[in-house]
Amino acid sequence: MPISKMPVESMPREKLLSRGPDSLSDAELLAIFLRTGTQGMNVLELSDKLIKDFGSLRHLFSATEAEFCAHKGMGQAKYVQLQAVLEMTQRYLAETLSRGDALTSPSHTKLYLSSILRDRQREAFYILFLDNQNRVIKDEVMFEGTIDAASVYPREVVKRALHHNAAALILAHNHPSGVAEPSQADRRITRRLTDALALVDIRILDHFVVGDGEVISFAERGWI
């Protein structure tokens, strides 16, 4: 059925305006982004098919240009638009952290770190450098490694923290295996970094491990 023949209250845009964005399904949200369908499929049918083909919205969003454009009705222009939306979302989360106390918005912190690290194929060690009010000064990937390990050098972390004049750090890294449970090696390097940074009066506030659909906090476990 053409989407124009659907009841007005069931159309994605109208439904969003009347009930809010959280009332929409993944396919309905994607339909608003896509705007039009293809020959033989209205935009909702196309959205539903894309999500099923990729397995989830997340896998659709992390698809390469070639993978995305291989689907009927999807071209370079739509791929560019999607990447722009994702980048704006990431910047919004980063700005939210930089304007306030990172520790008063743990859900934003986890969401931001997950968006940065979750889909990486190799392990990456990421640091949020904070001022004395726990606001983000700078965030960056410090180390990248193989598919299952990243070498972390405490001396380099200390140098970078001093360069940014940081008062505290939040650490994060991903597990490409998808299993977020911290390893003994994760706990050891956290202790080494804590000890090294303490020599220059810089604290580690938390260490997050990002897996597939889960982010584990050392602080919440009482390990920091």
Curated annotation (Swiss-Prot):
Renumbered to this chain, motif JAMM motif spans 173-186
Instruction: Write the record's keywords in alphabetical order, separated by commas.
Output: Hydrolase, Metal-binding, Metalloprotease, Protease, Zinc
Q: Could you tell me which residue ranges the MPN domain spans? A: 102-224
- Pfam families attached here? RadC, UPF0758_N
> Which parts of the sequence are annotated with region: Disordered?
1-21
Q: Which GO terms describe its molecular function?
A: metal ion binding; metallopeptidase activity
Binding annotation for Zn(2+): 173, 175, 186
> Could you name the domain of life of the organism this protein comes from?
Bacteria
GO biological process assignments: proteolysis
Q: Which PROSITE patterns match?
A: MPN, UPF0758
Tell me which positions the record assigns to the signal sequence: none
Q: Which family does it belong to?
A: Belongs to the UPF0758 family.
Query: What protein name does the entry list?
Result: UPF0758 protein VS_0182
Q: Which organism is it from?
A: Vibrio atlanticus (strain LGP32) (Vibrio splendidus (strain Mel32))
Q: What is this organism's lineage?
A: Bacteria, Pseudomonadati, Pseudomonadota, Gammaproteobacteria, Vibrionales
